[in-house]
A protein has these predicted regions:
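Residue-level recognition of short, well-ordered coil/turn positions
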Residues: 16-19, 28-29, 68, 174, ...
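Cofactor-binding active-site loop characterized by glycine-rich and histidine/acidic residues
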Residues: 30-172, 193-196, 201-208
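Glycine-rich ThDP/TPP pyrophosphate-binding loop and its adjacent helix/strand module
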Residues: 118-300
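Short, cationic motifs built from Arg/Lys/His that form the positively charged side of catalytic pockets
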Residues: 15-18, 75, 228, 248
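Conserved acidic/glycine
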Residues: 1-56, 254, 258-300
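Intrinsically disordered or highly flexible coil/loop and linker segments, enriched in small
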Residues: 17-21, 100, 104, 235-239, ...
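Short acidic, gly/pro-rich beta-turn/loop elements at beta-sheet edges
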Residues: 21, 80-82, 188, 252
Length: 300
C-alpha cells in the first residue's frame, strides 16, 4: 500500500492548484455563487476543474513509473499533476504565457508533458481512449517494460471510441489500464438517463476485461485496487479497467453555477470529500504536524 501521507500530498497539491485556477478564471465569482476575488478574470476560456476527484488521480498515479504513459480528459489537471508535471508551467499555460507547456496556445484542455509520460489532456470526450490504446500497442511492439493508462469520464462510455478501444486492447492483449472517473454527471446532465444498459465495469467484463469498481473518494481503496490491476497488467495479463465512483464538487466549467444540480446532492458530495476524509485519518494516526506541513507546502 502506498504511504497515505504521500497520497494526501498529491491530493492537496491538486486541490490547491484547482482552487488557484478557479479564482483566476472567475472574475470575482466562484462556483455556487460564492465570492472569490474582486479581481478581473486572468484565465480565459473554459476551465474544467477536477475538484472532488483528487483521490482517483492520486491513487492510480502513485503506482506509475516515469516510463508509463497516460492520456487524460478535458478535466485533466489532477492527472497531469499526479503524473509529475510542473505546476508552474501548467498555470502559465492556463494564463496563455509563452512559458506554459504548450507555449500558452493549448490552454487547460491540451496540456502535455512527454518527459513524464503525460501524452496530453483532450477536449473531445472519449478521444483519449484510442490514443492510450495506440500508445500501449507501441509499448508492446517495442518490448518496453511500461504500461499505458487512460482516464475517461462516465459520459465517454456512450461514445464509439470507448468500445472500439476496449475491443482493440483485448484483441491485441495490450498493457493498458482504463480508468473510468464516474461522477454521474455528463457536463450538465445526469448520466443515468442517457445510458442504456450497464455501466463501464459490465461493458468491460462483456469483452473479457477484468474490472473493479471502487469508492473513488477513498484514496486508499483506489490505490489498493489500482495497484493490483497495474501489477496484473505488468505481468502480462492484458487490459484491465478500474471504475471509480467519485464526485464533482464544481460546475462543468469554473464559471458554471451548477444550478441544475439538487443542492442536497451537492452537499452530500461535499460531505464525502476525499481530502477531508484522508486528513481526518492522518490526524487520528498522530500525523497532525506532517499534515499541516503538507498543506503549507501546497500553497507555495
Amino acid at each position: 500500500m502506498t504511504d497515505l501521507l504521500s497520497l494526501y500530498r498529491t491530493m492537496v497539491r491538486i486541490r490547491a492548484f484547482e482552487d488557484a485556477a478557479e479564482i483566476a478564471s472567475q472574475g470575482g465569482v466562484a462556483a455556487w455563487g460564492k465570492q472569490a476575488s474582486d479581481k478581473p478574470a486572468l484565465v480565459r476560456g473554459p476551465l474544467h476543474l477536477s475538484t472532488g476527484q483528487e483521490a482517483v488521480a492520486a491513487g492510480v498515479c502513485a503506482h506509475l513509473k516515469p516510463a508509463d504513459l497516460l492520456t487524460s480528459t478535458h478535466r485533466g489537471h489532477g492527472h497531469t499533476l499526479a503524473k509529475g508535471a510542473d505546476a508552474t508551467k501548467m498555470m502559465c499555460e492556463l494564463f496563455g504565457r509563452a512559458t506554459g507547456y504548450n507555449g500558452g496556445k493549448g490552454g487547460s484542455m491540451h496540456i502535455a508533458d512527454f518527459s513524464v509520460g503525460m501524452l496530453g489532456a483532450n477536449g473531445v470526450v472519449a478521444a483519449g481512449l484510442p490514443i492510450a490504446v495506440g500508445a500501449a500497442q507501441g509499448l508492446k511492439i517495442r518490448g518496453q517494460d511500461a504500461i499505458a493508462v487512460c482516464f475517461f469520464g462516465d459520459g465517454a462510455i456512450n461514445r464509439g471510441p470507448f468500445m472500439e478501444a476496449l475491443n482493440w486492447a483485448v484483441v491485441y492483449h495490450l498493457p493498458v489500464l482504463f480508468v473510468c472517473e464516474d461522477n454521474r454527471i455528463s457536463a450538465t446532465t445526469a448520466s443515468a438517463p442517457m445510458t442504456a444498459g450497464p455501466g463501464a465495469s459490465a461493458r468491460a467484463a462483456s469483452m473479457g476485461i477484468a474490472a473493479v469498481q471502487v469508492d473513488g473518494t477513498d484514496v486508499q481503496a483506489v490505490s489498493q485496487a489500482a495497484g493490483e490491476l497495474i501489477r496484473e497488467i505488468r505481468t502480462g495479463s492484458g487490459p484491465r479497467l478500474l471504475h471509480a465512483l467519485t464526485d464533482r464538487h464544481k460546475g462543468h466549467v469554473s464559471v458554471d453555477p451548477g444550478t441544475y444540480r439538487d443542492p442536497k446532492d451537492v452537499q452530500a458530495a461535499l460531505a464525502r470529500d476525499g481530502i477531508a476524509r484522508t486528513r481526518a485519518q492522518l490526524v487520528a494516526q498522530g500525523h497532525t504536524a506532517q499534515v499541516e506541513q503538507i498543506e503549507r507546502e501546497a500553497q507555495t
